Regions:
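Alpha-helical hydrophobic helix detector
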Residues: 1-14
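N-terminal helix-rich module
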Residues: 11, 15-34, 41, 45, ...
C-alpha cells in the first residue's frame, strides 16, 4: 500500500511543479493584459490617448500628457525579479530588449500591434496583441 502511495506521489509532483512554473510566468502576462484592456477602455471613454510604459522591471499605465504640467493617476506593476520580456514591433525583424518602450492606445481604441516574449529561465511564452481589441492572440509557449 505504501508503495502505491509513493508511486502516485512521484507521478503527481512533476505535473504540479509544471503548473506552478507556468503560473509564475502567466501572472505578469495577465497583468499586462489587464493594463492593455484598461488603457483601451479609458482612452475611448475619456477621448484621450493612454500609454503603457514597458520598463525593464515594471509596467506603468498612464494618460499621455500634453505639456500641461499636471499629474495624472497611473497604475504600476512590478515584474518578478526572475522574469524578463522583450518586444517585437511590426517593423522589427526580431525581438529586441528596450529599456523604456511606449505602447500607445489612441482614443479610437486602436493600439500598436506588438509581439511579446516573456522568459523565466528556459521557460517562455510568446504572444501577439491584437491592435483592434488589445487581447492576446496566437500564443505559443515552452514550459519545462
Amino acid at each position: 500500500m505504501l508503495f502505491i502511495i509513493a508511486v502516485i506521489f512521484v507521478v503527481a509532483v512533476p505535473p504540479a511543479t509544471h503548473l506552478l512554473d507556468e503560473e509564475k510566468l502567466q501572472r505578469p502576462i495577465r497583468e499586462l493584459q489587464t493594463f492593455a484592456r484598461t488603457a483601451r477602455r479609458d482612452a475611448m471613454l475619456e477621448d484621450r490617448a493612454y500609454e503603457v510604459l514597458l520598463l525593464n522591471d515594471s509596467y506603468i499605465l498612464r494618460p499621455v500628457q500634453k505639456d500641461t504640467g499636471g499629474t495624472a493617476s497611473s497604475m504600476r506593476y512590478e515584474l518578478p525579479a526572475d522574469i524578463t520580456f522583450v518586444i517585437k514591433r511590426l517593423s522589427d525583424h526580431d525581438f529586441a530588449k528596450q529599456a523604456d518602450a511606449r505602447w500607445v492606445f489612441s482614443p479610437n481604441g486602436l493600439c500598436e500591434p506588438l509581439t511579446f516574449l516573456f522568459q523565466r529561465g528556459s521557460d517562455w511564452i510568446r504572444f501577439r496583441v491584437d491592435p483592434l481589441t488589445a487581447t492576446l492572440q496566437t500564443e505559443e509557449s515552452y514550459i519545462r
